[in-house]
Amino acid sequence: MTTLIKNIGLYRNGKVTENQNISLDGKYIKDFPENPKDEDYAEVIDGKGMLAMPGLVNTHTHVAMTLFRSYADDMELMDWLQNKIWPAEDHLDDDIVYWGSMLAFAEMIRGGTTAFCDMYMFMDSCAKAADKAGIRGNLARGLAGISPNAQSGLQENIELFEKWEGAGDGRFHVMLGPHAPYTCPPDYIRQVRDEAMKRGIPIHIHLSETKGEVENCLKEYGKTPIALMNDLGLFELPTLAAHCVHVTDEDIAIMQEKHVRVAHNPGSNLKLASGIAPVVKMRKAGITVGLGTDGASSNNKLDMFAEMRLASLIHKANTYDPFAITATEAMEMATVDGAKCLGYDDLGKLEKGALADIILVDRSGFHWHPRFDSVSLAVYAGNSMDVDTVIINGKTVMRHKEMTTIDTEKLYAEVDRVTEKLYAFSKK
């Protein structure tokens, strides 16, 4: 199907050009016609006054954890995990994860996120929800070598790959998801590595999120988590490492040499008091850094506009440098760099031949005036509620702030139902 998006401000190559048009052919961007005729297209979207941007890419999250939002707040990571989250997760099932995931996808699409990278459990249910929602995703089954389900979890992840890799007209890719060095002993990491190498599956892992994690790893193995994973050969596979808050110069050198990509989660890292990742130093070393929200239970929202703003502001403050992460750089981290983190070279940019993941942002609000610089406004003043229209893989999944793939009334009812089901354990 051919689509014309006309009369828009077009974000390309770090700047916005007004009164532009985009034509789509199926799931790809075809060109940028100067004088298009409406009758030549099957669908015409008039974006007058709006800003066309690449869809935002959430490089690290746990989508079904929307159902833990506000359940456990103001805690440090290990206390939060061990005493609240992990016990509650024992009560998850396919039904709960499906609707928790659908809630996340509604929130993502509403806020302009068109692609995500998830690590969780009951991932077949997550994939089914993502397919119904029409969103793009990289999927990984979270794996814990210390769990009684270590082997069955790995098998689930392999089956997820066999079923979903390349599915959804190319919208889905699958990764293996060893949770972290503190939940995955070396022998298990080697097993995951070997299974991934047999099939060419990339890796998604949490690394060096807290000081305590690094200190314990040094005490047990004499190496940082990143050095340990490198010695175990994990980085011989394409790897996306979430967090990387407490990393040494030697760690950064390893990551640069092995082309490890980083999912930076500023909101979650601040809320859990984990620290601030040395993103400026990593970017200067040539490491690709994307942005993520982490789960809604530790953020507590899936708002990539908020993450762009945070990523720019906290690194200015942390380095005493107003140029540390500019508005344009924050935008690139949330789009094209995020796409690279997920393994794409034809996503996250509005170029001929690129995948048509596009959002139209309403610039009519008070906070969009005066309009000296639309990139600056998007990052520092814009918010997720400004998003008007969302196109993923060439298909319109939200039009004028109305979902086309998700029945929101049914969604709210089902979320209430599965929330009651999930938390029944706390009433016993």
Where are the regions a protein language model picked out?
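Helical hairpin unit composed of two closely spaced alpha helices linked by a short loop
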Residues: 271-273
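His/Asp/Glu-enriched, well-ordered alpha-helical/loop segment
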Residues: 231-234, 238, 280-365, 381-383
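Active-site gating loops and adjacent loop-to-helix segments of metal-dependent hydrolytic enzymes
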Residues: 67-99, 106, 133-144, 211-238, ...
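Divalent metal-coordination and catalytic microenvironments
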Residues: 8, 22, 27, 49, ...
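Alpha-helical scaffold segments that flank or form the walls of functional sites
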Residues: 69-135, 156-167, 416-427
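Active-site microenvironment of metallo-dependent hydrolases
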Residues: 1-20, 24-25, 30, 35, ...
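Metal-coordinating catalytic core of metallo-dependent amide/deamination hydrolases
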Residues: 125-245, 250
